[in-house]
Amino acid sequence: MSNEFITFEKISRKSWKQLHQKSKPLLTQEELTSITSLNDNIDINDVIEVYLPLIHLIQIYKIAQENLSFSKSLFLKKDIQQRPFIIGISGSVAVGKSTTSRLLQLLLARTHKTSTVELVTTDGFLYPNSTLIKNNMLNRKGFPESYNMELLLNFLDTVKGGQTASAPVYSHEIYDIVPDQQQTFTNPDFLIIEGINVFQNQQNNRLYMSDYFDFSIYIDADSHHIEQWYLERFLSLLELAKHDPANYYTRYTSLPQNEAIAFAKKVWKTINLENLEKFIEPTRNRAELILHKAADHKIDEIYLKK
């Protein structure tokens, strides 16, 4: 074990699944398929063995957070302020963050039937393409400087304070912020924040997004596996774009497959891999839990902070 993981407890999947014995998955295979991202690989068995124990762990953290909030209110002689339990989820492009986020949202809603569970991605806080082009940063999209961190931190601060907050909406189909569209959140019970940058803050080293989290997860995998998943996803996106002229990826559909793959490999190496190695992976030890995936997308190891 490297020094990076010295503060984590390493748990095998076999041991992890025994920590929670419920076998009812809380959703159907059809529902699971509907929330699974392109080229991801997950089944009901994964839900039972990995995600149900995780839901149970999150409940433990939520109870602890509520107890602390109550005790602090007594100490300060103030009324308890109802605020969301915020979960941050990070990891590389194409590692499966979106599938995990949507699955947790569904499972939390099924477990806490009277609670509201919302999901927001940090993609919405990217600067619009027009701004990136103006500042010659379009080729840095996804890197720390391409995010409006002030807007993102203000959003988190508002949500954490129990107030109504709005977030911009990003579309992967148009590869840009959707004009005049907002996602509004009114003091949900749970808020999941998903993005490659949720443990970063390049503008203010004294304040991290993770300061607002009650629980945090990093989705991990070997970079050469993630590259393969990225290439597979890129080809799937090209197939979808063939019949949609408005889709950003339509411009690449006329390329021969070998040229399309070469282009995707270049993007991976010069943008996504560099971003992963310099800015994303170095933040993973800020997570409370690390889910490690094997080559087949299956979670094989879990690291829980001691």
Curated annotation (Swiss-Prot):
Keywords (alphabetical) are:
ATP-binding, Coenzyme A biosynthesis, Cytoplasm, Kinase, Nucleotide-binding, Transferase
Q: Name one GO biological process term.
A: coenzyme A biosynthetic process
Q: Which domain of life is it from?
A: Bacteria
One cellular-component annotation, GO? cytoplasm
Q: Where in the cell is the protein located?
A: Cytoplasm
- What PANTHER family does the record point to? URIDINE KINASE
Q: What's the protein here called?
A: Pantothenate kinase
User: Origin organism of this chain?
Assistant: Streptococcus equi subsp. zooepidemicus (strain MGCS10565)
The organism's lineage is: Bacteria, Bacillati, Bacillota, Bacilli, Lactobacillales
Per the record, the gene is coaA
